[in-house]
Structures are given as C-alpha cells and as structure tokens.
UniProtKB/Swiss-Prot annotation:
This is Small ribosomal subunit biogenesis GTPase RsgA. One of its GO terms (biological process) is ribosomal small subunit biogenesis. Residues 56-217 form the CP-type G domain. One of several proteins that assist in the late maturation steps of the functional core of the 30S ribosomal subunit. Helps release RbfA from mature subunits. May play a role in the assembly of ribosomal proteins into the subunit. Circularly permuted GTPase that catalyzes slow GTP hydrolysis, GTPase activity is stimulated by the 30S ribosomal subunit. Its main location: cytoplasm.
C-alpha cells in the first residue's frame, strides 16, 4: 500500500495503482494502524483490501510498515548538523529494528579541512556499523553510490527541513505511478489534501518513503534501562562491567565509562545516553 487519503487506499501491483477500500472485518476494526503505507496486502476483483499480511516492522511516528532502511539525512552546512537529532533517529531505528544509514548532503560547501573534521565527528558511525554517505545533490556527488545501496529496498527518510531531501528523492525516483495531486483531483479534495507518508518508486528498484512524520520525533517507548542499553551497540561489544546491572553512570569499574575516557566510545553518544536515561526515568516514575 503506497498511499492513503480520506479512506481510500492506493495499492501498487505490477506497475499499476488500484484505488481500494477496506472490506469486512478490516473495515469494522479500522484504525490508524490497521492498514498503513508499506503494508503488503491482498485485493479482490472489486478493489477491496481483504487481507493485510504480517509485518516485518511497524514505525509509529511516522506510521509506516515493512521498512528496510531509515535514511537519516542532514546537511554538512546550512543548516549545520544536529548531532543530538542524529542520535535520536539512530535510537529510533534500533528500537524498531530497522537498519539506519546516515546521508550528509551539501559536502560541496566544505573545504578539505572541514570535510576531514566532519568525517572525524561522524567516525562513531563506523564503530556501530552504520553506513555513511557523503553526497552533493547540486554537484551530483555520491548519489549513484547511495542509489545502488538502496536498490530493491524500502527506505524511509528522516531529517530536518532544508537538507535537500526533495532533491535527493527527485534523483532516486522513477516517474511517479500516481502523483498525490492526481489522487486529490480524483477525490475532489483539491490541492490542500492532507498528505501522510507517500511511497515513491525508485528508478533503480525499490521504494523511498517521503514523510513529514519525523518533524516531532520523541524518545521511543522504551520500557526499562536494560532495553535502553541494548539500543547502544557500542556498549554491548566490550568487556563486562564490575557490576552485572551497571547503569554506566555512577558505578565504579564501569567499562563503558572507561571506553569513553579512552575515546573508544564517542563522548557525544555517551552524553546522549545519559540524557535519554534521565528523560526515561521521569517517564517511568
């Protein structure tokens, strides 16, 4: 299912788009999580959705299903990179069991020295096995490398405004199967139709999901400290701390703090962990 507007569900199959409605028990139990962008569905001859197949994953904000990658896109300059937001999006990806990648656009704005400095600041990504791509949509640098990486996958893009997401999507997409404006016209909703996540076919194969849903992202609904720690890969691949239930905050003999002191774990990542734990402690209490 590639798009939903006012009760109509647009399903792509073999290069065609079908305007569908929910049927039977699906219609009776309809809610915002019932049939979402990315769902694999079965449709009947009368264009009714009769079955929604089991999901690989489900993002809650934005609401999309069966995603392979979360592409976290930022600009090297104008606006400058928000490292805390990168960490929040990484946390979100790990929480929903979606593979993250980081894309930095506008590298043509940087001097050689600034580019070296940027790579150093983002070196923590390699330590946690997150691929990074440095691109310039304006100068067509690095775009084909990302396209080949995302080929035949379903990718949702997250990041702030002004970082070139539209230019990047325009490079990736094939001719749109059915534009939002065309759907709006058919439904006589006009150009002001509220648009949620929209699934766009890529010319190399696969889909890119354009969504406004990351604008108000928050810390996910993590249930306890152990779960939070599990979402920081760099905390897991080191020797055990002195205490089995170490919080990595106050305890002596903490190997996470030792790794931070030795610059083997990013201090910014560790500070983000502490800040997130504080937020969650307030939530849990």
């Amino acid at each position: 299912m590639i798009n939903k507007i006012q009760g109509f569900y647009y399903v792509e199959s073999n290069g065609q788009v079908f305007e569908c409605k929910l049927r039977g028990i699906l219609k009776k139990t309809n809610n915002k999580y019932n049939c979402v962008v990315g769902d694999r569905v079965e449709i009947s001859e009368d264009n009714s959705i009769v079955e929604i197949f089991k999901r690989d994953n489900l993002l809650i904000r934005p609401i999309v299903a069966n995603v392979d990658y979360l592409a976290i896109q930022f600009a090297a300059k104008h606006p400058n990179i928000d490292f805390e937001r990168i960490n929040l999006l990484l946390l979100t990806a790990f929480y929903y069991k979606i593979k993250p990648i980081v894309i930095v656009n506008k590298i043509d704005y940087l001097t050689e020295e600034e580019l070296v400095e940027l790579k150093e600041k983002l070196s923590f990504l390699e330590r946690i096995s997150v691929p990074m791509f440095l691109i310039s949509c304006y100068q067509n640098i690095g775009l084909e490398e990302v396209e080949n990486f995302l080929k035949d996958k379903i990718t949702v893009i997250g990041g702030p405004s002004g970082v070139g997401k539209s230019s990047f999507i325009n490079f990736l997409q094939s001719e749109r199967i059915l534009k939002t404006g065309e759907i709006s016209e058919r439904l006589q909703r006009g150009k002001h139709t509220t648009r949620d996540s929209n699934m766009i076919k890529m010319k190399a194969g696969g889909y890119i999901i354009d969504t406004p849903g990351f604008s108000s992202i928050e810390v996910p609904n993590i249930e306890n400290r152990e779960e939070l720690i599990s979402l920081f890969p760099e905390f897991l691949n080191i020797d055990s701390c002195k205490f089995l239930n170490c919080s990595h905050i106050h305890e002596p003999g903490c190997n996470v703090k030792k790794q931070v002191e030795e610059n083997k774990i990013s201090k910014e990542r560790y500070d983000f962990y502490k800040k997130t734990l504080e937020i969650l402690l307030e939530r849990w209490n």
